[in-house]
Amino acid sequence: GEKKTVTIRGLSTDIYDRVSRLARETGTTVGEIVNEALRRYIATLENISKAIDNMIRAGDVIVISGVSSLTVTRADLETLDKPVVFKDMDELVFADDVNNDLIKSKVARIVNVGTVYVPKSVSTLLIASKSELVKKIVPR
């Protein structure tokens, strides 16, 4: 499309420096790299959205969202008759009585959550395999 100068407020100087270096090393421009990165990021978000929408439409999952902080116990997960998608939260805390088997059977996805806290007995890789756009997974 048409090119114009755009200012991005709040862009991390570290990210800008890395993109700038990448542009020099690859012989492209900062704009081209940012455009491609945003294009891929948006496509990823759209794909995640579509996948979750399909699961919801098929009636395969329960969605819990719009809560800033949530603590989930074994009993909470066992009460559900379908796997759950946790989305759009600052933090999600799995209580100490939650184990790997319960995560495998009852947690469909964790999407757009700042920090997920898990008991030390729960595999962080298992949590990561069910996560999209999760900033941190912290064993406690």
Describe these PLM feature segments.
Residues G1-S12:
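Short Lys/Arg-rich basic patches
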Residues G66, L80, D88, F94, ...:
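Repetitive beta-strand solenoid architecture
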Residues A43-D76:
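Short, positively charged interaction helices/loops
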